[in-house]
Amino acid sequence: MVCTRCSTYNQASYILDALNGFAMQETTFPVVSVIVDDASTDNEPQVILDYFNENFAVNDASVAYQEETDYGRIFYAQHKKNKNCYFAILLLKENHYSQRKSKRPYLSRWQDNAKYIALCEGDDYWTNPHKLQRNIDVLNKEPRCMMVCSRTQLLSEKEKIITGESFCKTSDGWLDPKDVIQRGGLYIATCSIVYRNSIDGYPDYAQTCHVGDYPRQIFCALNGGVYYLNHCYSVYRINNPSSFMGKYYNGNNSDEIMLRRKTETMMLNALFSRCPVLCAAGQV
């Protein structure tokens, strides 16, 4: 089973693109897409539920369920037509981002049983129905491979057009760990990532870093490898003022952004100190 993890907040204008991208995946295996709304203050929760109620078998008691918890409301069901597609909707009651609270404990019922984890935030989306199948085929074929990523289109929120592409290489192949480290967290687009859920020995300094994707990319590159597919399967939205990267590149110096910068530096310092062989070889 594959678990797709989608965190979203105040993305009512964009979330339907993400949901459609999840639902259209054609796979030979079941996929549970976990959509976590972090107590949005716009109309996003209702947009998500309307889509869910329209496209999923919410009255099929053999699969579907709803649950009220102290932290949020949960909705789970199978897609009416795509029988390998399941949605788990979690509408949080309180905003966890502002409180620096982890959402991971709430995802264990779906994530723990998954062999692979796919990532896509609420303002990004997938464009190819074979995206997941092709990613998983690589992971199944290459036992040492820890992560797969791909070329990604860049959609300008200001201009409403595709303005370019984000790519790591000009052909399929393994990424050099040096490039993964030196080129930073944007070298690999989050919405293109699928990784093995069985990551053993994930270091503490990576778990406490507030830029979660970047240390995972580094760890996977150094422990098995990251394989790159030179084909566009997804869209990364740029110039979105409500996203973290939009705030980051617009010069927003909020406490959270400063904390992310600080913990990223701490993570890299810890990596260099614990990997002297890599440093001596000039790899980082």
Label the model's feature ranges.
Residues 125, 129-163:
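Conserved donor NDP-sugar-binding/catalytic core segment of glycosyltransferases
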